[in-house]
A protein has these predicted regions:
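Absolute protein N-terminus
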Residues: 1-2, 110
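Feature captures the catalytic cores and cofactor-binding loops of soluble hydro-lyases/lyases
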Residues: 23, 32-46, 50-110
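N-terminal first-folded block
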Residues: 3-45
Length: 110
């Protein structure tokens, strides 16, 4: 499934624009601990996290994630959005909880 298809399935917005829309997603990972994310996120994943600071971009780049998904319509600072665009990292935002987004992604990828 591509990122564009996933966005339609889980009803979220791409706050960084059309970055990575054609990339294939293999799996997902949910964690708010950066060290846990670094240790466990697989390549070609989407990462669901409530963290919204600049360091999430370093983790996403290191692990080559397709997108970061922010739950509960939480706001992301413009400086983080701008840096994500510069680095080619997609950030999505959904109104659902992290649990609900995880379930939607899991079911969409099955």
């Amino acid at each position: 499934m591509t990122l564009a298809e996933l966005i339609g399935n889980i009803r979220c917005e791409a706050i960084t624009g059309d970055i990575n829309m054609d990339r294939e997603i293999r799996t997902g990972y949910t964690s708010d601990l950066l060290s846990d994310a670094i240790a466990n996120i697989e390549e070609d994943s989407v990462w669901i996290t409530m963290q919204r600071h600049i360091n999430i971009l370093g983790v996403a780049k290191l692990k080559d994630v397709v997108a970061i998904v922010i739950p509960r319509s939480l706001q992301v600072e413009q400086s983080v959005i701008d840096k994500a665009r510069e680095e080619g990292i997609a950030i999505l935002r959904g109104s659902q909880t992290a649990f609900e987004i995880s379930a939607l992604i899991y079911n969409a990828l099955r």
